[in-house]
């Protein structure tokens, strides 16, 4: 068997590097019993390499291309064009020509063929590369087919293919092209079959797009397609398009576009029987490959031919269930303000820390809420809580509940909270003593200091046992009933204030102002403390100039050579000693902390120096406190004028005191958790250094791709199959490209919610109002905190914020996020800083462009773009 040209039936599963993704799948398809694949052969990558390997000019151009970035579009275009020209002019090796001629003689030279590209970086489980290289239809004759083989080779360097490889991290010099030559099928109809619904991701629904003639009309967007949906062997939906034209093959070669007769334009492309037959074929192919497929098909002489099948790479994985029942899962990341994927060690630690059972999928965590939705009472309580947190999530759950047949109902749970109790109930009777919070904080800090001391003597298996024991201590602190009551009481007090002040005084969201500058909020204090760091640096221009150019994380050691450098270093070290364990995505223990990468803080410090006068941190806090006191007095005075006013004022005063005394504590348990996480991490990284010295791992960060239990075993035995690390790194790269759903079912269906809002201005973008007020300003769309370049008065637009973003809040005048709820980080800090904010705005960072002027309506929950 020649390695230059292979028949489709000769292709083996291990030959990706020879035949590319498309060739590999066609080889597999041709072996499935009952699946019709047009006969053909593959000119392998060996033939391509043999044709170009001696061309020195081409190698120079490839080296130049490798040095470019995606932004260098003009240079990419020029170099790619030169490469294509060289490849077109290269002689095809004589043994390749001979082998091609032999196969064509075997299949019939007189027939027409499709000549199709198949790259080694194409149709892979993690990157489809669909449509990046060229396909040519209805080619007749040996010479013409050889010419089009060269064209396919050259199409490896179209601008779009080059840019796509850059975006997906593939090396141009390591991607090769094979060419598939297949007997041409002249179909009456053709199209695409998805074995999972491409809109909802439901794995039980097949979706068929169908049109007359060749499939190129659909792929190129020339015509609209009929769309058929099939579930459990039944057609559940039909949408018949007006098909005005189709592409057909010409007898003399090539293709042509033809108008469809008007009486046929609305005709159903496939009969119902054919739709169901095609669906069965799709399920058979999916079962063979073991995952949902994107299948190209055509119908000729009442026979379905399959001309391609590739994995659907955009589906979010389904959380695993232990049974075959229907399940509903909600995203933990949307509640934690962290929708990025988490590495295995991070997932492992979070699962060890939490008390709620969770499922993993796509590098994220999900909670199975099926039981909560099954009984009427627990459902009402649960949905009420979700509505306060995330209205889009609640609406998605309501969509599932309305189907009635998806979740089996169970009797009411007698232990469930009484749903009849409303928000307007007076907050539970707790001792309204601010020292309770101080005592809880002091106890947590003492425990952390003890941990830091005790862990220093631990190593090897002792360290892992010690960490497991300390996590139990962490859980006691995190889920301390006293802490939970304080936080819940403060939340209820805010809800009570908002409801009663609206009812009694017609004033919306009064609790927002009352929540400004509360004591003991470790997160908002963190933002103000960085203003104090800026105050230390501000008098020293040499230090400021140095910081503007710093890139090395060892910069703190260099500061001493400048006037004011020692003071700057000490101020930053003091800041890091209290807040250095924080970072973006901090619930993932593997994320790089500020103490590990202090340059992260530099842009924020410089922004503070640029945007603010000295001592502004204290003034901001005091201003917020005075506004809260003023609002309190105003409300109490107005209430006393009402019937039964003294009693109303008394109840309101108590609720306000609860907000002022307790609401700041809400941010503290998480601060304690990430504090401990950083201590654990530093100890584990010392173990990683030992593993590097022993040759078990290549770099410290390799341990992030092991679970806690796996890492313990590796430390104990010094044995590891490194392929596990490599595979999980590839998986993580794939997960980074996926957007996690708020709600996903056990069928894989992604159920989305929507806001039910009326009477909004034309073009308004809707979200959840979480901090009242109206502000107009320049939108700064920032997806990475390190890229922040803010001016006083800007409005921050981003996907989500967690506590690490708080230092930016001192510079902005408003907030818009894609993810969030009433009590999530951004909302809480926005209220404390007095910033109008709207969260849960779908695709905000795409709909709003950086630099646009926008108006944020924090009271009503929408944004206007000007």
From Swiss-Prot:
Contains three domains: an N-terminal ATP-binding domain, a large central rifampicin (RIF)-binding domain and a small C-terminal swivel phosphohistidine domain that harbors the conserved histidine residue essential for phosphate transfer. Signal peptide: none annotated. Residues 326-754 are annotated as: Rifampicin-binding. It catalyses: rifampicin + ATP + H2O = 21-phosphorifampicin + AMP + phosphate + 2 H(+). It is an enzyme of class 2 (transferase). This is Rifampicin phosphotransferase. It holds the Pfam family PPDK_N. The gene is rph. The lineage of its organism: Bacteria, Bacillati, Bacillota, Bacilli, Bacillales. It comes from the Bacteria. NCBIfam families: PRK06241.1-2 (NF004877), PRK06241.1-3 (NF004878), PRK06241.1-4 (NF004879), RIF_Ptrans_rph (NF041857).
